[in-house]
Regions:
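Conserved Helicase C-terminal RecA-like lobe
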Residues: 1-15, 27-146
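Cytochrome P450 catalytic domain signature, combining two hallmark sequence patches
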Residues: 17-24
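SF2 helicase/translocase ATPase core recognition
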Residues: 1-16, 114, 122-123, 127, ...
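Short alpha-helical scaffold segments that flank and stabilize functional sites
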Residues: 21, 81, 172-176
Length: 201
């Protein structure tokens, strides 16, 4: 996915500010532990910017999120083909944005994150009701142990450092009882830290 110009600018600003902060921290003689924590925090901000800049800047225009635009296109292509989707993100804020997107489009969906109390009810609904085309799932909350064979498309909205966690999430659709071919999509923002995450996998 190619970032929009506004998104590239936002990403470059955050990257520049991260480099400046880390340089200041190093010059101040900070411990290795402090440097590591600061680096992880800055990487997190860059990864969030790749997903949707509104995660770091709530005033950022929604239509300038390249990944959301790409997801929208993929979603409608899949729906037109009669497919049902599992959409994973490690960021609950991303899932909330996708939830708002689906609500605005009038699409029914199931939703599961770490705070969901009705976990099995959501799973049963998706499995049994074929009028529900999308299941939004937090990677940590629903990446293991669920049987979601009603889906034949898996979308990873953002890459995870641990490829095993992604593979386990994709396996939710590959369970016994799956009689369709399952297609897995990974949305990766080109020229960013997401490509580095992919290489580390």
């Amino acid at each position: 996915v190619e970032m929009t110009e506004d998104q590239q600018e936002c990403y470059a600003d955050i990257r520049q500010s991260a480099e400046t902060e880390l340089s200041k921290l190093a010059d101040s003689g900070a411990s290795e532990g402090a440097m590591r924590m600061k680096t992880l925090t800055q990487l997190l901000r860059l990864r969030q910017t790749c997903c949707d800049p509104r995660l770091v800047d709530p005033d950022f225009p929604a239509d300038q999120s390249a990944k959301l635009n790409a997801f929208r296109e993929l979603l409608y292509t899949c729906l037109e083909g009669g497919h049902r989707l599992l959409v994973f993100s490690q960021f609950v804020k991303v899932l909330q944005l996708l939830k708002a997107e689906l609500e605005a489009a009038g699409l029914t969906f199931c939703y599961l994150d770490g705070s969901s109390k009705d976990r099995m009810a959501q799973v049963d609904r998706f499995q049994e009701d074929d009028t529900v085309p999308v299941f939004l799932i937090s990677l940590k909350a629903g990446g293991t142990g669920l049987n979601l064979t009603a889906a034949d498309v898996v979308v990873h909205f953002d890459p995870w450092w641990n490829p095993a966690a992604e593979a386990q999430a994709s396996d939710r659709a590959h369970r016994i009882g799956q009689d369709k071919q399952v297609t897995v999509y990974k949305l990766i923002t080109s020229g960013t830290v997401e490509e580095n995450v992919l290489q580390l996998q």
